[in-house]
Amino acid sequence: MLPQLQWSDEVIYVDCESSDGSLGKAEELGCKTFSRPNDRNLNVNKSFAMDQASGDWIFYLDPDERIPSELVEEIREIVASETEYSAFRLKRKNHYFGKWLKHGSQYPDIQLRMFRRGKGKFANQHVHEKLQIEGKTGMLKEDMLHYSYMNISQFLKKFDFYSSFEAGFMLEQGVQVNSINHLRYFLFRPATRFFRRYFIKGGFRDGIPGLFCAFFDALNIMVRYFKLWELKRKNS
């Protein structure tokens, strides 16, 4: 990911306890590097990175995301212009096991990633929370690429990480473990989610990766509720 970002004025790399040599590589490429604890709320470290930026515009991305050359040119044109917008959204192409998922609510996966410095912030409360923008927001034409999961082992590791964080958030929000929620989280919500993603939104058109995505998206609802139950037992 890092070499393709050399077109930018500065690259800020926040390493969250990685063990693959990424930090050293970032230092070799001249990035501004920082080491931070791997906070379960990823937005805490994103907020930290944003505070280190010195340019007029910020574009943030994760290690499994890529910016095609067409998107680079569009970004350059906007930065050089006198645009009225404070931020820009874009479409993201999600890839599971090397396949771009065009259906099942996976595309267009709208993301807000580019904004003027000082005009965007996270509340740092939840892993999936959106950037809060001061001002008008536009839309980019070109897509960003997202290689979500390259293999099953990588997927299961991320699945465990995110479901644990979401269970903790449910605990903080006061979600109860009771008979009504048993039905809600073990039956109704997973079944509805799978049916919508796989059949109504056409996830079946994406073959095995589409089935995998829809199934585990539904399973995540059950697993995070199981983990909530575990947390409550541990705290009782």
Q: What are these regions, as identified by a protein language model?
A:
Residues L23-S54:
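Conserved donor nucleotide-binding strand/loop of the catalytic core
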Residues W7, A53-D56:
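Active-site acidic short loop of glycosyltransferases
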Residues M1-E10:
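Short, well-formed alpha-helical segments that are part of the catalytic scaffolds
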Residues C16, G55-D56, L61, E65, ...:
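Residues lining hydrophobic/aromatic ligand-binding pockets adjacent to catalytic sites
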Residues Q4, D15-K25, N38, D62:
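A conserved acidic beta->alpha catalytic loop
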Residues N43-M50, W57, P68-N235:
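Catalytic-site signature of metal-activated, phosphate-bearing donor transferases
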